[in-house]
């Protein structure tokens, strides 16, 4: 799901998502990180 992290590129979301979900799968969507 979406987390409260602003981004411009999907790679900016990899670390935050790994901390939240334990998975590095992430996308930057509408300048916000989405974890899968």
UniProtKB/Swiss-Prot annotation:
Disulfide bonds join 7-28, 13-33, 17-35. InterPro entries: Scorpion_toxin-like_sf, Scorpion_toxinS_K_inh. It is found in: Secreted. The record marks 27 as: Basic residue of the functional dyad. It comes from the Eukaryota. The record marks 36 as: Aromatic residue of the functional dyad. Keywords: Calcium-activated potassium channel impairing toxin, Disulfide bond, Ion channel impairing toxin, Neurotoxin, Potassium channel impairing toxin, Secreted, Toxin. It holds the Pfam family Toxin_2. One of its GO terms (molecular function) is potassium channel regulator activity. Poorly competes with (125)I-kaliotoxin binding on rat brain synaptosome (IC(50)>100 nM). Is a poor Kv1.3 ligand. May have as real target KCa1.1/KCNMA1 channel. Shows weak toxicity on mice. Has the structural arrangement of an alpha-helix connected to a beta-sheet by disulfide bonds (CSalpha/beta). This is Potassium channel toxin alpha-KTx 16.8. It comes from Buthus paris.
């Amino acid at each position: 799901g979406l987390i409260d992290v602003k981004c411009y590129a999907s790679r900016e979301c990899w670390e935050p998502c790994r901390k939240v979900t334990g998975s590095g799968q992430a996308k930057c969507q509408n300048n916000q990180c989405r974890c899968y």
